[in-house]
Amino acid sequence: MDSRTGEPITVPQAENGVYIWEITNPLYFKIISVEDPLYTNTRIYHLQIRFNHNLRRALDLHKAFLNFQVWTTSTTASGRTYLNRFKYLVMLYLEQLGVICINNVIRAVRFATDRSYITHVLENHSIKYKFY
């Protein structure tokens, strides 16, 4: 859903893409926080994927923040280590597809989190399209 207007995102908007080799560094990966709940063997990573300015311009986006909360049983990996692994898998999937769009990034995250040590993935996105 468009965060600014409240209207649902249409299929052509979600599937509108650009070739990945046309834009350098199309995505910015950021780790917001890492939680270690008491008395459990889980670790919660709060990750954010931001679209680059050139990618946003090509897709007619004003703002695109994809927020993920990844619940994992792997407590040995630090936040930076997991972020590097996550980024590598997402970019690997997108480079194999060759086209980057909102839906393909979400599919790439599903590919990256389809591992035995990941129990849950929660999504919360902030996407705004340009009016003009």
UniProtKB/Swiss-Prot annotation:
Which controlled-vocabulary keywords does the entry list? Host-virus interaction
Provide a GO biological process annotation. Answer: rolling circle single-stranded viral DNA replication
Q: Per UniProt, what is one Pfam family of this protein?
A: Gemini_AL3
Query: Where is the chain membrane-spanning?
Result: none
- Does the UniProt entry include the keyword Protein transport? no
Q: Does the keyword GTP-binding apply?
A: no
Relate the assembly described in the record: Homooligomer. Interacts with the replication-associated protein (REP). Interacts with host proliferating cell nuclear antigen (PCNA). Interacts with host retinoblastoma-related protein 1 (RBR1), and may thereby deregulate the host cell cycle. Oligomerization and interaction with PCNA are necessary for optimal replication enhancement.
What does it do? Increases viral DNA accumulation. Enhances infectivity and symptom expression.
UniProt similarity note:
Belongs to the geminiviridae replication enhancer protein family.
Protein name per the record: Replication enhancer protein
Write down the species.
Tomato golden mosaic virus (strain Yellow vein) (TGMV)
